[in-house]
Amino acid sequence: TAGKPGTFIYRSGTDYELQNQMGLVGALIVRPALGAGFAYNRADSRFTPDEEFMLMISEVDSDIHLAVELDEPYDLTTYRTRYWLLNGRAFPDSIAPNGASWLPNQPYSALAHVQVINAAHPYPALVRHLNVGTVSHPFHPHGENGRVLGRDGRPLEGPAGQDLSYEEFVFDVGPGQTMDVTWKFADIEQWDGDPNSPNYNPVPGYEYQKQNLVRGELFGSPYLGQQDGGLTGEVSFNACGEFY
């Protein structure tokens, strides 16, 4: 029985540098006695249970994998990361849905979907960050700061249980570290994307002109409005082949 709740990394206890690359590493989530809607046994660690996400950061040096496949030695002092993964996926697969049929061995998406904070939905989302790689990864949730509740399976609290959680614009997840962060979206400007909401206010997209096409984050809309079926014969410039 686990002695305390939190977010933990499990890994091989022998030849870690090699076996980590071979996939002998993972996440272990221990629930508190308060229930599934709490990160720790603290009332102020409450979150929305349907908005709990995990981001496990890992790395791949393809030369190590080739050496293992060919049963050849590998000098770990020459280690060089070639690929960075979130939940075992590289972009654009990292934003594919949970349980995507073409990713049978990587079932978890890295794309967090959250609802607007309001009276009917008062609690934030919880993102559990785990870094099983060799370098630090600074994270920033666009649009809002994240509140760091705990690190390495321990709540941020003082000797008398006082709340020591803090907000960060960018939080750095170090190698071998876990970090529990809450995130919320307050729809101050009423950019509501729910068609059933009384505040529904999509900005329509438009067909861009090829001569005015700019490579970069130009989506044809100030925000992603309503998804449409796309244009006949359209060659998309976005990863998912969608038109908004």
Sequence positions of predicted segments:
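Copper-binding active sites and cupredoxin-like electron-transfer domains
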Residues: 1-244
